[in-house]
Amino acid sequence: MNRRLIICVGLLLFTFSSFAQLRDIPKEVEQAFTAQYPNATAVEYRDNLVNVKILFTHKGEKLIASYNNAGKWKETEKAWNFEQLNADIKDGFQKSKYADWKVTETKIVNRPDGVELFRVKVEKNEIQKKHLFFNAAGRLIEDFITL
C-alpha cells in the first residue's frame, strides 16, 4: 500500500513538473533582463503566466528579478539577514504591531526609480503570515498576507 502511494505521488510530481512551463518565455522579458543584467550567470526563468521570475547570479550574489509579460521590470530581490538590517529598520519592526511575530525571512527589494525596500516575512502561526516592507528609515510602507 505504501509503495503504491509513493509511486503515485512520484508520478504526479513528475507529470506536474514536466508541464510546468506552459509557454515560451516572452522575448520582451528575455531582452529586458539581458539588457539590465548582461553579466548574469546561472539564469533560470520561471513563468507564472502573469509575470516571469528570473533566478540568477550577478557579481557573486544570488538574486531574483521579476518582470511583467511586456518586459517591464518590477523588482529584484536579494536574501538578507535580519540582524544585518540597520538600527532604524529593526526599531521600526520592534515598534510595529508585528513585533511579537517570528521573523522567518528577510530580503532587500529594489524597485524602479531607485526605491529600496526591506522585506521581512513574519508569522504568528501556521495560518497568519505576512510580508512587511520597510524603507531605510524604518517606516512600515506595506504589508501583505502571504502563504
Outline where the language-model segments fall.
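Mid-chain, structured segments of secreted extracytoplasmic proteins
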Residues: 65-106
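A short linear hydrophobic-aromatic micro-motif
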Residues: 39-45, 102-107
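N-terminal signal peptide c-region/cleavage motif recognized by signal peptidases
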Residues: 15-17
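Boundary of Sec targeting at the N-terminus
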Residues: 20-21, 33
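Short, low-complexity, Pro/Ser/Thr/Gly-rich segments in the mature regions of secreted, periplasmic
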Residues: 135-147
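Positively charged n-region of N-terminal signal peptides that target proteins for export
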Residues: 1-7
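Exposed beta-strand-loop-beta-strand "reactive/processing" segments of non-cytosolic proteins
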Residues: 41-64, 114-132, 146-147
